[in-house]
Amino acid sequence: MSKGEKVGKERRRYPRLQGLYLLSYINKERGVQKTGVSMARTINISPVGVGVEVYEAINRDSVMEMEIAVRDIVYAVQGKVIHSQEKSSGNYVIGIQFDQVQKELGKKL
């Protein structure tokens, strides 16, 4: 699939688009920072959330403070991990729901 292509049959209000963007993040659990600043890459993204591949386990309900670079703009966003799944490679795929709809980000996708 190419960048920006819809994934499967989409029924969401804000469809997730496949896209590879770099992001930095800080993971917080119950208000306590669990990691230093770490790097990851997006798998899919929409104005309401993002799928991310990371190299460490991150628990559900963790708060993620992120900076996502999309084209020439860096977006500072915050969200909550709604699912986490370990891959056979040992990496993890996590789904993050943003705290607020990112309309400006959606315009860049």
Name each model-derived stretch:
Residues 72-78:
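Short, Lys/Arg- and Gly-enriched loop/turn segments at beta-strand edges
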Residues 26-61, 65, 95:
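Short strand-loop-strand
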Residues 42, 79-81:
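Conserved hydrophobic positions within beta-strands
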Residues 1-45:
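N-terminal helix initiation/capping motif
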Residues 26, 45, 84-85, 101:
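Residue-level recognition of beta-strand microenvironments
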Residues 24, 60, 92-109:
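Short solvent-exposed strand/turn elements
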Residues 14, 53-57, 73:
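Short, surface-exposed secondary-structure edge patches
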